[in-house]
Amino acid sequence: MSDQYVISRRSALGVIGAGSAAAALAACSTSNSNGGGGSDSSKRDDYSGEVKLEKFDTSAGNYEPATREHPAKNVPKPIKPDNLNDKSVEGFYQNIAFLVAGMQYISMTADGSALKESNIKNKEQVSTLEEQMKSSGAPDKSWSEDFTVKASLDTPQPKIEGDNYTWEGKLSINLGSFMVRDGQAIDIPEKSRHQEMPYTFTGTYKDGTWEIDLKPKTSASSGASGGASTGSGSGGGFGF
C-alpha cells in the first residue's frame, strides 16, 4: 500500500482516538431544548452491542459502492441528532454514534463537515485532516472498496461519575478487498482487511454540551483481528 494513503487513514482514526488529532496528524442542527437540565434518563436499559446512528441525508441520490474504477458515490451523510446535547445516557450514546458515522463519512469523502458538527475533543483539527486526506488523493484518486467504521459497547450502561461518563467498547475497521491509489487498484491481503481494537469512550458534560473522547486501550494485545496497532503518542490511532 502507498504510505501516504495509509497515513491518511491512520490519521483519520487518530482524530477519534483520545482527542489527540494533533498527534495523529504529526504521524503523517439544533440541540434539544432540554440541554443540560435535570437528572439522567435513558431511553432504554441495554445499549450494548453495535452503535447505530438512525438518520442520514440521502438527498444526493442512490448510493453506489466503490469499484476498482470509481470511489463510492452519493455517500449518505450523517444527520446530527436533535438530542446531541442532552445530559443523559441516550445523549452520550448519540454522540458516539454521530461521531463514528462522521468518521466513516470523512474517510469516504474527505468531507469533515459532520465531524465538525460533533462534540469530539480537539475538533479544530478536522480541517487539517481534510487537507491532508485531499493531498493524498482522497476521495477521487484514493479509496478502498468497502471502508466502514463501527463501534460497539461492551456493557448495557456506561459508568457515570457526576458529569463524567465512561463506556468500554470496541472500534472496528473494514477496508474491503482492494484499495485504489492514483488510479491503480491494489489488492488488500485478507488478514489486513478487518481490524478491531478495544476502545474507551468518554464523555464530559460541561456548560450544556458534551466533550467526547475516544481512546484505544493500549494495554490490549495489538494482534487483535488482523494485526491492529495502537499507534504512538497519547491517544494513538488505528494502525494499518
Language-model-derived ranges and their functions:
Residues 19, 37-54, 159-240:
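Exposed beta-sheet edge and beta->alpha loop/turn motif
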Residues 105-112, 152-164, 169:
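N-terminal short leaders/motifs
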Residues 1-7, 19-23:
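Secretory targeting signals
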Residues 138-158:
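A short, amphipathic edge element
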Residues 16, 21-25, 29-91:
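Juxtamembrane and targeting peptides
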Residues 67-145:
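Core segments of small alpha/beta cavity-forming domains
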Residues 9-13:
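N-terminal export leaders
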